[in-house]
Amino acid sequence: MLIIPAIDIKEGKCVRLTRGDFAQKKIYLDNPADMAIIWRKQNAKMLHVVDLDAALTGEMVNFEKIREIVELLDIPIQVGGGIRSVEAVEKYLSIGVSRVVIGSAAVTNPSLVADLLKKYRPSQIVVGIDAEHGVPKIKGWTESSNMQDYELALEMKKLGVERIIYTDITRDGMLQGVGYETTKRFAEKAGMKITASGGVSTSDDLHKLRSLERFGVDSVIIGKALYECNFPCQELWYAYEQDLGIDGEFSTARKKECCR
């Protein structure tokens, strides 16, 4: 199972939210590119980058920050957040982004997804479904759609979408464990390749998700748990302090025994 570290960008900084609540924003580093370097040093094979400002406004506010990450790293970068036009997709792919994530637009403008899949490979265009109790949320999780999560997935499947990034937002940023049953239910009904997201906080969560590989769950996006050093043998503190020398939430005071 592929583990994909997440980088959320708000007002140019690397942040994490709790259940998508912008009022519960925690800044980890001022420069998201520095965070990307840390995850690459941790042997990340792909990064999931989200422009949170764009998710709210539809404007590519943090485009240059994302460009910097793409230019610095030698691994695929997946980008989401407020991508609602063919032009936005073209702009991201033109700078070397490997995969774009269509979220709200899959609900509000499904013809966009159809148009994109006529022009690009399915591996380049994926759909993100962020669900609360089975109902997709859109526009930065501020509005609900009028269908169930699996119904949206099946509609996207008809258009040629092959992969869904599925986020259980009741778990996102909570560090309270993955929504195993919710993800299992969705994966069984969708019958597609699934990247799981939301709530992963321990290695036990990863083992649970791995048991869903037979239903198409082959990868997982992890955010806050990595930032809080919840996994044994994370060496990001060493890489951070020795090579980057940046002050911030990542400090010696926050070291854990497993990270030494």
UniProtKB/Swiss-Prot annotation:
Gene3D superfamilies: Aldolase class I
Active site residues per record: D8, D130
Broad class of the protein's primary localization: cytoplasm
SUPFAM superfamilies, A to Z: Ribulose-phoshate binding barrel
Subcellular location: Cytoplasm
Pathway(s): Amino-acid biosynthesis; L-histidine biosynthesis; L-histidine from 5-phospho-alpha-D-ribose 1-diphosphate: step 4/9
Known EC number: 5.3.1.16
Keyword NAD attached: no
GO annotations of cellular component type: cytoplasm
UniProt entry keywords in alphabetical sequence: Amino-acid biosynthesis, Cytoplasm, Histidine biosynthesis, Isomerase
Keyword Amino-acid biosynthesis tagged: yes
Pfam name, any one: His_biosynth
GO terms, molecular function: 1-(5-phosphoribosyl)-5-[(5-phosphoribosylamino)methylideneamino]imidazole-4-carboxamide isomerase activity
InterPro entries named among the record's database cross-references: Aldolase_TIM, His_biosynth, HisA_bact_arch, Isoase_HisA-like, Isoase_HisA-like_bact, RibuloseP-bd_barrel
UniProt record, GO biological process: L-histidine biosynthetic process; L-tryptophan biosynthetic process
Catalytic reaction(s) noted: 1-(5-phospho-beta-D-ribosyl)-5-[(5-phospho-beta-D-ribosylamino)methylideneamino]imidazole-4-carboxamide = 5-[(5-phospho-1-deoxy-D-ribulos-1-ylimino)methylamino]-1-(5-phospho-beta-D-ribosyl)imidazole-4-carboxamide
Similarity remark: Belongs to the HisA/HisF family.
Entries under HAMAP family matching the protein: HisA
Protein name, per record: 1-(5-phosphoribosyl)-5-[(5-phosphoribosylamino)methylideneamino] imidazole-4-carboxamide isomerase
Highest classification ranks of the organism: Bacteria, Pseudomonadati, Chlorobiota, Chlorobiia, Chlorobiales
Gene label: hisA
